[in-house]
């Protein structure tokens, strides 16, 4: 009886197909219709300039440092530019996308001499959780206090968005005034703050 050598069959061989890569989420766009990039700076402006200006930094609640993320009340002011980068290991794709974890930091110098990266505060100041800059005071086990997302503003046909803090869970970010009617702070509150992104000049 003749022997049969392995691999000599004329039958075609079939290999499992590699898993298909999920489609990337849609990109975020600036006011000129260009995709947001991790190597560029942007102003975060109110979609309705009658509701105030861009995001900036301000002291609050009796603290000089760290600085709180706040909104300039003057609709003609752009605030400070920010740099938005993917959370975790930087991918080769430099496009900032919807529903994807990002880190946000101001591209500005302060008298506090510390990081200007955003994070959600674990403490309640005036009964709310604020977005502040600087190092995280009491990090959670997950360490995701500095994780944020950009989501499309519901029903918007233009490039309008909302910001979310996405630590252990995601929360909409809105603007509210302090108890003394002073600064306008960014924090976990409703209604959420509707924003647009305007490209800033290179630093």
Swiss-Prot record:
Residues 15-26 have a biased composition (Pro residues). Belongs to the protease inhibitor I3 (leguminous Kunitz-type inhibitor) family. Disulfide bonds join 65-112, 166-170. SMART domains: STI. This is Alpha-amylase/subtilisin inhibitor. The keyword NADP does not apply. It comes from Hordeum vulgare. This protein inhibits independently subtilisin and alpha-amylase. Residues 1-22 form the signal peptide. CDD domains: beta-trefoil_STI_ASI. Residues 1-12 have a biased composition (Polar residues). GO terms for molecular function: alpha-amylase inhibitor activity; serine-type endopeptidase inhibitor activity.
